[in-house]
Design a protein with these regions (language model features):
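Sec/Tat signal peptide C-region and signal peptidase I cleavage site
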Residues: 8-12
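Short helix-loop boundary/capping segments
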Residues: 156-161, 181
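Histidine-centered catalytic micro-motifs
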Residues: 174-181
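Solvent-exposed loop and beta-edge segments used for protein-protein assembly and interaction
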Residues: 97, 171-173
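Short, recurring structural edge motifs at helix starts
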Residues: 162-169
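Solvent-exposed N-terminal domain segments of exported/luminal and surface proteins
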Residues: 13-156
C-alpha cells in the first residue's frame, strides 16, 4: 500500500504553468498588475506607496533546467531533455529551485533627472556607474520569473552566456532561473 501511495504521488505531479500556478492579486493594487501579472502574489504596502510582488521565480513551462536527477517527464512534467537551440548551445550546470523574492515598486515612480545614457553608463562592466542595475534579481517578469540585468556574471560575456538559454530565453544562475533584461 505504501508503494502504491508513493507511486501515485510521484506520477500525479501537476505541470507548473500559467493555468496551475498560484496567482493572488489584491483588489486595491493598480489595474496594470491585475490585468497582466500571473504566478505572483501582489499586495499594496501599508503606506500605499508601493506595490509588493512576491514570487518564486519558477518558469511556468517546460525546460531542461528543472532538476533532472532521477526524473522523467512522467514524474516531473516540467522537465524536458536538453534541446540544442543552435550551434554552440549548451546546458549550464544550474538547476531550478523555488525561491522567495519580494520586489517593491513605487505606485507613483519619479524619473531620475539629468541622467544621460551613453557608452560610459552602458559599458558592459559592473560598478562603473551609479546608474547601473546591481547583479542578481532586479525585477519580476509578468509570469513570475525573476529578471537580471543585461550583463553576464563577472568574468563572463553575455553574448556567450546566451548560448545556454532555454527555449524561452532563460537559464539559471546556480539555482535561480531568470531572464536578462
Amino acid at each position: 500500500i505504501l508503494l502504491l501511495l508513493l507511486t501515485t504521488k510521484i506520477f500525479s505531479q501537476e505541470m507548473y504553468n500559467l493555468e496551475t500556478c498560484e496567482t493572488d492579486i489584491a483588489y486595491n493594487v493598480p489595474q496594470f498588475y491585475q490585468d497582466f501579472f500571473q504566478c505572483v502574489k501582489v499586495r499594496l504596502s501599508e503606506s500605499g506607496d508601493y506595490v509588493n510582488l512576491y514570487f518564486n521565480a519558477k518558469p511556468p513551462y517546460q525546460t531542461w533546467y528543472y532538476d533532472a536527477s532521477n526524473v522523467t517527464s512522467s514524474n516531473n512534467p516540467n522537465w524536458i531533455p536538453f534541446q540544442s537551440t543552435g550551434p554552440g548551445s549548451y546546458q549550464n550546470p544550474g538547476v531550478i529551485a523555488e525561491q522567495e523574492f519580494v520586489i517593491s515598486v513605487p505606485v507613483n515612480p519619479t524619473p531620475r533627472q539629468g541622467v544621460i545614457i551613453n557608452a560610459s553608463t552602458v559599458d558592459g562592466e559592473v560598478t562603473t556607474s551609479d546608474y547601473e542595475y546591481p547583479m542578481g534579481s532586479i525585477g519580476a517578469a509578468l509570469n513570475g520569473v525573476t529578471l537580471f540585468n543585461p550583463l553576464a556574471a563577472p568574468g563572463d560575456i553575455i553574448e556567450n552566456e546566451a548560448f545556454s538559454f532555454d527555449l524561452y530565453n532563460g537559464h539559471p544562475a546556480g539555482d535561480t532561473y531568470h531572464y536578462h533584461t
